[in-house]
């Protein structure tokens, strides 16, 4: 199929590369860090996306206001549809500002909504395609905010995302999704993901802003402290999730040493 489209559109518009077969994170980062791919702006996509016609237009309207040497990330909500392309809901609406204090606790948007500039891509190149992170989109959010970049979260959905039983990553909404996250928290998944993200951020430490270097160090110390010290140190970091329920869940994670 891809070969047919390459013939139809021309080799200059569609290139096909062999992936590393290391799961979705390794595959996305392999392509993102491919030296043969050169552009001013980059966007992720997969087979379950149906882009809105104005997606790139809205992204570029904002990205062009950011200096080219400043890492910049545009992301949005998602319109969820079923296998027949019928709308079934929206991804969560987040209203608190995007920041490193938030990125340490969660990702705010799916990679399929993200468009980022070359300065942001240079951060991903610095860490490399083999960096061990929980998710490629969360990693972009972490890298850009850690290094003083700008993030625009647009409440307007930029695409339709098909939901079906074989989705690798769900929509992150509804009671079932919340229960799944709670179960994963108490199984230690969140703590493992944070450990991997912290290790990966070490690759960018020299590019991080001084306040964010301090914040990361405080976060690490809080995770390594005993119960009451952990609670006190964590509260002093200012790290937050986007919702009250999310912050309550994070407090439980701190108390039970699952962060």
Residue spans of the language-model regions?
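C-terminal subregions of glycosyltransferases and related glycan-biosynthesis enzymes
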Residues: 129, 133, 139, 162-259
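Nucleotide-sugar donor-binding/catalytic module of glycosyltransferases
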Residues: 1-174, 255-258
